[in-house]
Each structure stands twice: as C-alpha cells, then as structure tokens.
C-alpha cells in the first residue's frame, strides 16, 4: 500500500475533506484559519485584553489550551467519573497576563467549558471545527519539539536519545486524527507501538475480550500509519511482520527499534506544516483579511507572508535573550525543530543556533515564577526567503553529524546533502540478524551501507524570494558541507514533562 499521504493531501487531512482541487483545499484551510481567528478575537473581548495583551504569545497559549481542553471528550468524561480534589471537571482556564501600571501581572481565569465550546462553535459557523482544534494541537506539538528534548521518553522505550530527529509530534494527543498522524515522526510512532506492546506483555487481558479487539484494531492502524511513512520495500515488509504478529512481544519491540534506527539513514516521510499561534490569526482576521476568500496553504508561502506582517510579543525572563526566544518560536512556527540548521539559517536570513547555545527557557511561564522581574519584547518571526515544506524524508546520503543528534528530518524542500553520522548509526547494527525478519534486516542494512556522502537530496529545489509568490525562480543555496547542522547538539534542553 502506498503511503497514507498519497491518497489525500495534507490540507484534505487537515479539513477532513473528500478529494478536492487545489482551490477548494485552499478555501477550506482558509475557512479553518478564519474560525481560529474569530474565536481568538472573541476570547480577547471576553477577557478584556488590550491589543498588545492579545498579541502576547503566552495569552495565546492559554486561550488555545482552554478550547482544546473544553473539547477533550475523553478527559472530560474521565474527570466526571474520577473527581479529584480542587478540579472542577466542568471548568477550564489558565494564566492570563495583563500590563498594569507598567508591570506584568498574572491573573488566573476560569470559564465553563460549555461556554468556551459555545464561543468556538459560534466562531466556526456552528460546527465543532475539529480541523481547527487539530491545527492548534500541531502548533503546540511543534513548539514542544523545538523546546524540549525527549531523552527520557526515548530511553524509557529502549531507544537511543540521539535518535531525537525521529520524534516529531511526540507530544501530540491521541485524538489528533489524520492530520496529526501525518506529522508524527517514525520514532514517535515506534514509541507509541512499543508502549502498547509493553502493556500487552504486563497485562494479559490487554489483547483479550471486546476491549482487546478494539486495542488490536488500534494497534494494526498504528502499524499501517508507520508502514506508510517508510519509503523502502524491506522496511514496509518488516512492518507487515510486526502488524501481523499473533501476540506482539519482545521480538516486535526489537524489530521496531531496528526500524527506528534504520530511519536515521533511510528516512521516513513525515509531513511538515506551518501552524501559527492563534494570536497571529486573530489580528489578521480583525484587520479584515478573509482567509477563506483569499485561500491559504500550510505548506507554501502563506504562513511566511503572514509572519512578515504580524506583531507577536512574548514575556521575557530576566536573563533570557529575546533574539533566542524569537528563534525558538520561529522554528516552532515553521515546524523546523529537526531541520538542518544550515537550511533554516539560510531561509531565516539570520544564523539559527543549536538548542544548547540558546539563552532561553520555554515560552510558557510556570505559576510559581516571579512576575515582578518579567519584561516583554517583540518576537522577530520574519524570514529572508520562503521554501516549500516537504513531506518526504529526502533521499539518502551521509555527512558528519553531531554528538547530540545523529540525523535530521528535513522540513523544507531545498537542495542539500542530509547530514547523518554513518559510523555511529551503523555501529548499532552489529549482531542480531537471526529470526523471521533476518532477510529484511540484511536488505535494510545493505541499503544503509550503500548510502553515499556526496548524494544530494531535493535536487534542484531551492528557496524563493518573498516577492516570488508563484515559486517561479528557485534560488538553490550552497551550504558549507563541513559545517554541522543539528539543533539538539550535545545538548542541555529541558525535558518535556506533561
């Protein structure tokens, strides 16, 4: 079966659409953006936020989280059935920041979920507008991917922390649908499957009975999603083995870890979408821009143009560097957490530096942080060029890569060689070549051995001037091949904790 992505474009996944032509897709994505924008404007009115406060990214995150929580059916049901002290299952809220007498103040707001759902539906012509909710989830996921390194989660499932380039979308909720599945990295899918298999090993009823049947269907569906991300026959054949296993256990976990490692060189197809915070869409809609009429795409020039003309602010802690905070958010907006820094730097027009060198913590402010010393500054989210987002892993070749991250997952469709540390990766493939998947393993290892350093990915693809809306004149950048391009380079990023 061909990859899931070939059947429906992202935008169709994004809008649950049947087959549509490009104009219809652009309109339906635009409609989704309009809905988010209208909702945001209404929430700013409800919360009595000034224009500046409404453009504060921390307020945007709180408002986005409130609506996502209001529509989280499963968790809402769970909260109703398992009341915990001090948590009202019918309410949602969070910190809202306001400027009072020249100082930033934190105010905790609480709303009925029913009320939030009403405002959201009203902004979306009465629909639940699931696509818009998923869009916000992907924005949060992209921000997490940029901010945190998932070392602990990788180690817990038996994977190597240096495989972090495979972990796109690892914090996306289960309910993120087809659009969410499209942006998940190979490592994320492998981790979800391993967790599932481990539960089955520890709980003998996991695969049994009516519930077990549903579990099995979910397991096979996840296997198919992962299979669809692989681009070689041998990797797909191995996924068939994992999917068809009568009683998934340690052999399957081994196979999955093997496949994840192989994806560092034989990269999977992972979609990239520029999902922006609601505080970007709100002001654009308020200024009279009609996204549905004009059309919008998450993978073309549109997000770049929107960011060129947007003012977004962020709270800054005393010893943080505002330029570094801007880089963090720029990468999140462009879904570029695992992109080669050489490519990101060229497109952005300013040097994009590794996570470990950034003097900034995450965007969110913890409830116990002191507000007295908080400043705010403008986030610089503009770019020098734009480029088309890719949903392929690029073809394979090799290059020196770093200690902290041994491969990349390209975001932009731009000609370059893809760095990965072949000796480090291949060292993990010694021994264990027996068992039912041995012939496929041998074939995969052979392909990895054959990956050459001089090969170029995305041949002839370039970046474009922001005035070149139709992408007519590609500028193919030349990169310093000796330079090193990993973001989580020998890194000290914070861990992601739910």
Curated annotation (Swiss-Prot):
Pfam families: Flu_NP. One of its GO terms (cellular component) is helical viral capsid. One of its GO terms (biological process) is viral penetration into host nucleus. Late in virus-infected cells, may be cleaved from a 56-kDa protein to a 53-kDa protein by a cellular caspase. This cleavage might be a marker for the onset of apoptosis in infected cells or have a specific function in virus host interaction. A motif (Bipartite nuclear localization signal) lies at residues 198-216. One of its GO terms (molecular function) is RNA binding. The keyword Ribonucleoprotein applies. A motif (Unconventional nuclear localization signal) lies at residues 1-18. It comes from the Viruses. InterPro entries: Flu_NP (IPR002141). Keywords: Capsid protein, Helical capsid protein, Host nucleus, Host-virus interaction, Ribonucleoprotein, RNA-binding, Viral nucleoprotein, Viral penetration into host nucleus, Virion, Virus entry into host cell. Residues 8-21 have a biased composition (Basic and acidic residues). Its main location: virion. The keyword Nucleus does not apply. Residues 1-21 are annotated as: Disordered. It is found in: Virion; Host nucleus. Signal peptide: none annotated. Belongs to the influenza viruses nucleoprotein family. Homomultimerizes to form the nucleocapsid. May bind host exportin-1/XPO1. Binds to viral genomic RNA. Protein-RNA contacts are mediated by a combination of electrostatic interactions between positively charged residues and the phosphate backbone and planar interactions between aromatic side chains and bases. Encapsidates the negative strand viral RNA, protecting it from nucleases. The encapsidated genomic RNA is termed the ribonucleoprotein (RNP) and serves as template for transcription and replication. The RNP needs to be localized in the host nucleus to start an infectious cycle, but is too large to diffuse through the nuclear pore complex. NP comprises at least 2 nuclear localization signals that are responsible for the active RNP import into the nucleus through cellular importin alpha/beta pathway. This is Nucleoprotein. The gene is NP.
């Amino acid at each position: 079966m061909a990859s899931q992505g070939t059947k429906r474009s992202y935008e169709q996944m994004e809008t649950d659409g049947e087959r549509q032509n490009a104009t219809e897709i652009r309109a339906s994505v635009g409609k989704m953006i309009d809905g988010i924008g209208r909702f945001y404007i209404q929430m700013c009115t409800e919360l009595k936020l000034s224009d500046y406060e409404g453009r504060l990214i921390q307020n945007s995150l709180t408002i986005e989280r409130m609506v996502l929580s209001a529509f989280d059916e499963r968790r809402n049901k769970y909260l109703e059935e398992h009341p915990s002290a001090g948590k009202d299952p019918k309410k949602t809220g969070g910190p809202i920041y306001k400027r009072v007498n020249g100082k930033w103040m934190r105010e905790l707001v609480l709303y009925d979920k029913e009320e939030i759902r009403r405002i959201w539906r009203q902004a979306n012509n009465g629909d639940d507008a699931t696509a818009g909710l998923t869009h916000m989830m992907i924005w949060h996921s992209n921000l997490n991917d940029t901010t945190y390194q998932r070392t602990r989660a990788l180690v817990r499932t038996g994977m190597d922390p240096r495989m972090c380039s495979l972990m796109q979308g690892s914090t996306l909720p289960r309910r993120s649908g087809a659009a969410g599945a499209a942006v998940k990295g190979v490592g994320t899918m492998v981790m979800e499957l391993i967790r599932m298999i481990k539960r089955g090993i520890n709980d003998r009823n996991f695969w049994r009975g009516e519930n077990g049947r549903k579990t099995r269907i979910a397991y096979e569906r996840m296997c198919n999603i992962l299979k669809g991300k692989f681009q070689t026959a041998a990797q797909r054949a191995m996924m068939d083995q994992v999917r068809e296993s009568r009683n998934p256990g340690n052999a399957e976990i081994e196979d999955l870890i093997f496949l994840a490692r192989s994806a560092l060189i034989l990269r999977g197809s992972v979609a990239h979408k520029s999902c922006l915070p609601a505080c970007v869409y709100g002001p654009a809609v308020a200024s009279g821009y009609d996204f549905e009429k004009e059309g919008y795409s998450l993978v073309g020039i549109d997000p770049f143009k929107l960011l060129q003309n947007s003012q977004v602010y962020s709270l800054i802690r005393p010893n943080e560097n505002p330029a570094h905070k801007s880089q963090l958010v720029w990468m999140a907006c462009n879904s570029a957490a695992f992109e080669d820094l050489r490519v990101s730097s060229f497109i952005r027009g300013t040097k994009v530096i590794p996570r470990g060198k950034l003097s900034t913590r995450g965007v969110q402010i913890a409830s116990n942080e002191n507000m007295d010393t908080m400043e705010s500054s403008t986030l610089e989210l503009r770019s020098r060029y734009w480029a088309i987002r890719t949903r392929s892993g690029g073809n394979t070749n090799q290059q020196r890569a770093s200690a902290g991250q041994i491969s990349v997952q390209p975001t932009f469709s731009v000609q370059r060689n893809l760095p990965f540390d072949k000796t480090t990766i291949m060292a993990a493939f010694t021994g264990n070549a027996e068992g039912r998947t041995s012939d496929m393993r041998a074939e995969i290892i052979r392909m990895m051995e054959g990956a050459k350093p001089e090969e170029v990915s995305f041949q002839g693809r370039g970046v474009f001037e922001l005035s070149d809306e139709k992408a007519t004149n590609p500028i193919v950048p030349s990169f310093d091949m000796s330079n090193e391009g990993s973001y989580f380079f020998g890194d000290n990023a914070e861990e992601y904790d739910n």
